[in-house]
A protein has these predicted regions:
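Structural recognition of the beta-strand scaffold that forms the well-ordered cores
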Residues: 21, 56, 84-85
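Short helix-terminating capping/connector loops at secondary-structure junctions
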Residues: 15-16, 49-55, 114-120
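Short, well-ordered amphipathic alpha-helices
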Residues: 36-47, 102-111
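Amphipathic, non-transmembrane alpha-helical secondary structure
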Residues: 70-74, 78, 166-169, 173
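C-terminal interaction surface of TIR/SEFIR-family domains
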Residues: 1-37, 44, 119, 124-218
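Conserved BB-loop
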Residues: 39-74, 89-98, 148, 155-156
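Conserved beta-strand-loop-alpha-helix hinge of the TIR/SEFIR fold
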Residues: 26-29, 61-62, 74-132
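Generic preference for well-ordered alpha-helical elements
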Residues: 33-37, 70, 96, 100-103, ...
Length: 218
């Protein structure tokens, strides 16, 4: 169900600024970054059918860390109704610790804001699954975006992609209506980013050692 204007107004008054926060690993892999970019545009476009100025946050910083960067990220996460996580093994890897912190923070916010609901505020989209998944991810029904890797950028022009974007937006709308029912407040002044990532149980794939001279000498 689209977010009615009255609900949109109440959520804005409660301190919510973004309809969703896109969480992804900043990597040279174009499947990951391209998916995040396309989702930002597609979600915003779909929401624009019922909302005058939909807002979707995606961090485009090339340099991570620092108090100012962390504050911007924290405020954007806190003032978002939902989080769309672009998942692949690299997203769970300890090298991208902030992905796990973003997940843990939004999970904590949802627990506080959506008491008694059988869903949270995180919407995982999976471009490559890992086996096993971290427990925090395995507990949530994810949306399969693996065709991004086999079809390439042309996938973003397919009916299948459009259907999945609509499914994401429907979940965002469901979360928005629930937040309104619970009279949730953003209450960002008291938000602390968790110290522990949500993916402590993740087992990264073993990485082969780089070839040394002895491997190819005859």
């Amino acid at each position: 169900m689209p977010i009615p204007p009255a609900v949109q107004a109440r959520l804005a008054a409660a301190g919510f600024e973004y309809h969703c926060f896109i969480s992804y690993a900043h990597t040279i892999n174009q499947d990951m970054t391209g998916c995040a970019e396309h989702l930002q545009d597609a979600i915003r476009s779909e929401l624009a059918l019922s909302i005058p100025q939909p807002q979707v946050f995606r961090d485009t910083s090339n340099i991570k860390g620092g108090a100012r960067w962390e504050q911007v990220l924290k405020e954007a996460l806190c003032t978002s109704l939902a989080m769309v996580a672009v998942c692949a093994p690299i997203y769970f890897d300890p090298a991208h610790r902030w992905c796990g912190l973003e997940w843990a923070a939004m999970a904590g916010l949802a627990k506080k804001r959506l008491p008694g609901e059988d869903f949270g505020a995180i919407i995982p989209v999976m471009i490559q699954a890992s086996d096993p998944l971290p427990q925090a991810v395995a507990e949530i029904q994810y949306i399969d975006f693996s065709k991004v890797r086999t079809v390439g950028h042309s996938y973003y022009d397919t009916p299948d992609y459009r259907r999945k974007v609509i499914e994401i937006v429907e979940r965002i709308e469901q979360i928005a209506l629930a937040l309104d029912r619970h009279q949730a407040q953003a209450d960002c002044a008291n938000l602390e980013i968790p110290q522990q990532t949500a993916f402590l149980d993740y087992i990264a794939p073993s990485q082969p050692f780089p070839l040394t001279r002895s491997h190819y000498e005859t």
